[in-house]
């Protein structure tokens, strides 16, 4: 799982070091997929083969001619760059993705559980402020608490415990 936030940098050749915990979350794979996040945040999103397989299975659930399926295929699958992780944990980000994310010099990596994001630090700060205003809203806390309780009840019913056990 991709968790936490890390600082990084892009060198003159467009290479970035993927944080060691993120490389571990990739399961030792030497490949990573990166695309422009489709939510308009300006971030790049990345993940491994497991995430792409999950997307493939999810897309197979949608009708072949579905506009939603086509949009996801176009904006994520077709727009993904498949990158090789070198022996030092670096990848070379394509220039078009660096431009789309306004990435140069310092960058931020943020874990998104199943995926991770690569951010321009200023964009990341703005995003954090927006997300903090959303997460503190009573309706957000209520929705999360309800979902949490449903998951916890399912886990307990399955004999897996309630609090992260």
UniProtKB/Swiss-Prot annotation:
Residues 5-51, 80-123 form the SpoVT-AbrB domain. It comes from the Bacteria. GO terms for molecular function: DNA-binding transcription factor activity; transcription cis-regulatory region binding. GO terms for cellular component: cytoplasm; nucleoid. Keywords: Cytoplasm, DNA-binding, Repeat, Transcription, Transcription regulation. PROSITE patterns: SPOVT_ABRB. The keyword Transcription regulation applies. CDD domains: MraZ_C, MraZ_N. It is found in: Cytoplasm, Nucleoid. GO terms for biological process: negative regulation of DNA-templated transcription initiation. Transmembrane segments: none annotated. Its main location: cytoplasm. InterPro entries: MraZ (IPR003444), MraZ_C (IPR035644), MraZ_dom (IPR020603), MraZ_N (IPR035642), MraZ_sf (IPR038619), SpoVT-AbrB_dom (IPR007159), SpoVT-AbrB_sf (IPR037914). The keyword Transcription regulation applies. Signal peptide: none annotated. Forms oligomers. PANTHER family: TRANSCRIPTIONAL REGULATOR MRAZ. Belongs to the MraZ family. This is Transcriptional regulator MraZ. It comes from Hyphomonas neptunium (strain ATCC 15444). The gene is mraZ.
């Amino acid at each position: 799982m991709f968790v936490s936030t890390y600082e990084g940098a892009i060198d003159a050749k467009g290479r970035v070091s993927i944080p060691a915990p993120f490389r571990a979350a990739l399961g030792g794979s030497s490949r990573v997929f990166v695309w422009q996040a489709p939510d308009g945040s300006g971030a790049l999103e990345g993940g491994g083969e497991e995430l792409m397989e999950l997307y493939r299975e999810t897309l197979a659930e949608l009708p072949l001619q579905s506009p939603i399926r086509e949009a996801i295929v176009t904006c994520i699958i077709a727009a993904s760059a498949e990158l090789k992780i070198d022996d030092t944990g670096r990848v070379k980000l394509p220039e078009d993705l660096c431009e789309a994310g306004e990435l140069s010099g310092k960058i931020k990596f943020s874990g998104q559980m199943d995926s991770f994001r690569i951010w321009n630090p200023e964009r990341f700060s703005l995003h954090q402020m927006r997300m903090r205003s959303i997460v503190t809203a009573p309706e957000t806390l209520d929705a999360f608490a309800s979902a949490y309780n449903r998951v916890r009840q399912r886990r307990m019913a399955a004999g897996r415990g309630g609090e992260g056990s």
